Amino acid sequence: MVYSHSPLKVALMALLSILFALGPARPVPAQDQKIARYVGTSACKPCHEKEFKAFTSFAKKSSSFQSINRLRKELTAEEIKACYLCHTTGYGKPGGFINEQLTPDLKNAGCEVCHGPGEFHAKTQDPRDIRGDLTEEDCEACHTSERVKAFRYKPLIRGGAH
């Protein structure tokens, strides 16, 4: 007996086999069904006062918007938007920085740049609702090798001053 299977049919059968092996899907908590929004560094202060004080006192990124303002006259609108990606909190993402007037609490690179949107964590205080232990890879979104060379700085995992 000869069987003829199209590649699509084989792929579909493989996918169904994998899904069957995984079993029924678990219910997703309501919180997991929506995207967390940015709440700003000041929302971290009530529970993380020591880290907040250290960050706002010593971390250069806590006042990173000043760098944009210093260079603003020399930059195009598109270049400024590119700066927003690393020098503000959550630019281009739900609840992230829009502009200095509408979202002043997000105008610098705050806690959530590294730790992710804090909406759920601020409500629950559950450590699973925020990125806690950071790695150097977490820094590489902004601290690329090109920027390290251009600005002569390197990512420091504890460079957030906490």
Report the location of each language-model feature.
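A contiguous, mid-protein "functional segment" used to position or interact
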Residues: 136-143
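Classical N-terminal targeting signals for secretion and organelle import
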Residues: 2, 22-25
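Sequence context of c-type cytochrome heme-c attachment sites
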Residues: 27-135, 151-162
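Short, exposed beta-strand-loop hairpins at the edges of beta-sheets
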Residues: 144-151
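Bacterial N-terminal signal peptides
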Residues: 11-23
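N-terminal secretory signal peptides that target proteins for export/translocation
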Residues: 1-8
